[in-house]
Amino acid sequence: MRFHTLLAGASWMGEYGNPEDPVEGKFLRSISPYHNINPKTDYPEVFFITSTKDDRVHPAHARKTAKRMEDQGHDFLYYENIDGGHSAAANLKETAKRLALQHTYLMQKLRDGK
């Protein structure tokens, strides 16, 4: 667990805890989506959205979680905008694209019941 070494991650330790502290690190791993992906669990298809230029939550978090899902055979979708920032949108066109992707995903899940 290295969120505190990437970009603004160190500023989150006051709110979330210090992963290097044995007690806090154990708790953080217990609630970490990445650390709790189970190959035997049947998850719904997850949609990861991130931005290459996110300076608050490093895109490596989404990348490595998607990779773990892939390695374990879970279905997922992944979209990484190369511009933008924390909101994954650099301008109105990119915002519209991201919202269209999100709404399409949601509507398909509601329609298909999966």
Question: Across the structure, where does each feature detected by a protein language model lie?
Answer:
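Active-site-proximal cap/loop segments of hydrolase catalytic domains
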Residues: 1-114
